[in-house]
Amino acid sequence: MSFAADLAKFPSATSVTVNSEGGAVTTNLQQGLAKLWCNWAGSATVNDSFNTASITDNGTGNFSVNTTNALANVNYCRAGFAVNTAGTSGVLLDSTTTITQTDSTTVISIEVNYLNDGAVDGNRDEVIVHGDLA
C-alpha cells in the first residue's frame, strides 16, 4: 500500500493514535486538538476563528461565543487571554464571576476582567476550547 493510500484513511478514522517520542506511550490525537478557538475585538468583531459561528456582546466584558458545531457536553475546558484597551497584557477571560448566562453545548460564556478593575472590553480577546464534539 502506498503512503498516499495510508493518508487517505485519516479523514474517515474515528481515532488517530500517535506514539510518544520514546515510543513508551500513545496519545489519541483527536482528544488533544482544540475544538474551538476565536480571536475577537472587544466589540465582538471576530478577527479569526475555528468552529465559531459568531460572538454576542452581552455588555462590557461579557461575551457569548456561539459555536458552529456543538460540543458533546458542558464539561469542556476553556482557556483565554486578552489585552486591555491600554495595550496592557494580563486580562483574564473568566466564566465564574458575574456572568448570568449558563454555558451550553453551543454557547461558551466569557467575561473579560482586568485585575481589580472589573469587566472590560479588551482590544484583543482570545479563547480556546478543548473537549468532545457532539
Show where each model-derived region lies.
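A detector of low-complexity, intrinsically disordered, Ser/Thr/Gly/Pro/Ala-rich segments
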Residues: 12-15, 24-25, 83, 95-98, ...
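Extracellular receptor-binding modules and their adjoining Ser/Thr/Gly/Asp/Asn-rich linkers
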Residues: 2-4, 9-72, 114-134
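Extracellular jelly-roll beta-sandwich "head" domains, especially the C-terminal globular C1q domain
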Residues: 86-134
